[in-house]
Design a protein with these regions (language model features):
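Non-catalytic cell-wall polysaccharide-engagement segments
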Residues: 1-23, 81-96, 102-176
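Functionally constrained cores in energy, signaling, and assembly domains
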Residues: 34, 61, 96
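Substrate-binding/active-site groove segments that recognize
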Residues: 64-82
Length: 176
């Protein structure tokens, strides 16, 4: 792998800015999600909003027993660390964590299909939160999920769901 213009390039690796916790990460991840992964603008903004709320794009963010850009915990955290090590990344790297997230999204084909065709960034933020993040708010203080992909989860409240939705809309407006 080599560095060029603040980007890291390598076989099968995300091509994005090598800056942690910055607007550079937001913009580079947006480009990666739309151009490489094929997500729509709204779908990419929904993912970005969740990562922003979870960790402000900081791959070393710790909240209790949760870690990284998507605040993985328990088995998923172990899986992320093992994946990164086995694929030549530091588990603390933005690139490694994004690569793991995309790898793990293969287990969510309906969500990926939705993110590729989404036109509503707020709905994309909800679907990513309920489907991938699974950030259930047991206190009941979060907003209720009103999406369509996971009807059994409509009874659940999700942590900072309104904030995720508002951030997705803000990002969508700024990218449009």
């Amino acid at each position: 792998k080599f560095q060029t213009n603040n980007h890291i390039v390598g076989y099968g690796r995300p091509y994005m800015a090598a800056l942690a916790g910055s607007v550079g990460d937001e913009n580079a991840l947006y480009e990666y999600l739309t151009k490489t992964c094929g997500f729509s603008m709204a779908g990419a903004c929904g993912v970005l909003a969740n990562i922003c709320v979870e960790s402000t794009y900081d791959p070393t963010n710790v909240t209790g027993r949760y870690y990284g850009i998507c605040q993985w915990g328990d088995d998923r955290l172990r899986n992320m660390k093992n994946y990164c090590i086995q694929n030549g990344y530091s588990p603390d790297s933005f690139q490694g964590q994004v690569s793991f997230m995309v790898y793990e999204l293969a287990d969510y084909p309906e969500l990926v299909t939705f993110l590729k065709t989404a036109t509503d960034p707020q709905l994309a933020a909800q679907e990513f939160c309920a489907g991938y993040e699974r950030a259930v708010d047991s206190s009941g203080a979060g907003a209720k999920y009103t999406g369509n992909l996971y009807p059994a989860r409509r009874k659940n409240s999700y942590q900072a769901l309104k904030k995720r939705m508002n951030e997705a809309e803000r990002l969508f407006q700024s990218k449009g």
